[in-house]
A protein has these predicted regions:
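Iron-sulfur-associated redox domains of electron-transfer enzymes in respiratory
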Residues: 1-263
């Protein structure tokens, strides 16, 4: 089985549980390999950069709303069906990464490890259930580490190098829209990016109501069900500010230039 870990995993399991040690610990308890979900986030970012510049900024499409948060996207589709076509059509990072893993490890199952209980419902969708076999929250994983007596102080780490800063930044509020806007600025410097974002479903509904009224034409809109982003998900273990700082540090450490060779 291969573990795909959401970007918000950083710092969740205590100060000794550095990213490289979490990867090693997952292998220690039985996973054959470990992949950053940030890899899939990067793929989605590139797709959305081109879509915004070619279709939204030109007026062909009304606006582009992110879709990686399942609680937000399901709410948008259910309560604002007339604008649901403006939600990003890119696969969510979980699904994009899982499909990649199934290609590189065809005989393995995939377990998504993250902060989000809504991902359990996403993984049950008919079009996704063959890609993601299991969903485990950080809280549940901590129980597995405890059951296996994992001591992060005694583990030798194994470095991660799957995701660019953009994908790793998806874990915090503003990170998704920020990644897309950064890509547009780099690849389409002549294009102005208009942005709006909301945290918490009540605020997300207000943002969508404004868009429905025609007041967000040409915008890039990010919705996050959890205030603070994925680092505030129901399956997390650390305070939001502490988790956000850890994610930002991990983001800055990425050696990958996502937009090198793009254009």
């Amino acid at each position: 089985m291969v573990a795909e870990v959401a970007p918000s995993f950083v710092g969740q399991f205590g100060p000794a549980a550095t990213p490289d040690k979490v990867k090693a610990a997952l292998k220690l308890i039985g996973f054959a390999d470990v992949v950053e979900v940030g890899w899939g986030a990067d793929r989605g970012t590139v797709e959305e950069v081109h879509h915004y510049a070619k279709h939204v900024a030109t007026g062909e499409a009304r606006f582009l709303a992110t879709s990686c948060c399942p609680a937000w996207s399901v709410m948008a589709k259910n309560e604002f069906p007339e604008i649901s076509q403006s939600l990003s059509q890119a696969y969510t990072p979980m699904v994009e990464t899982a499909r990649h893993v199934k290609k590189t490890h065809p005989d393995h199952k995939v377990a998504f490890i993250g902060p989000c209980s809504a991902k359990k419902l996403e993984a049950m969708r008919r079009t996704i259930r063959s890609d993601v076999d299991y969903v485990i929250t950080f809280e549940e994983l901590m129980g597995m580490f405890a059951a296996k007596d994992v001591d992060f102080g005694e583990i030798e780490g194994e470095p991660f190098a799957d995701a660019a800063p953009e994908g790793r930044g998806y874990a915090v509020s503003g990170g998704v829209a920020g990644a897309i806007a950064s890509g547009v600025h780099k690849l389409y410097p002549e294009v102005e990016v208009k942005m709006d974002r909301a945290e918490g479903l009540a605020n997300c509904k207000k943002m969508l109501a404004i868009a429905k009224a025609g007041k967000r034409e040409g915008y890039l809109m990010e919705g996050m069900a959890c205030v603070g982003g994925c680092v505030a998900g129901p399956g997390t273990l650390q305070p939001i500010n502490k988790a956000t700082a850890a994610v930002n540090k991990f983001k800055a450490e990425s050696p990958i230039d996502l937009f090198e060779g793009e254009g």
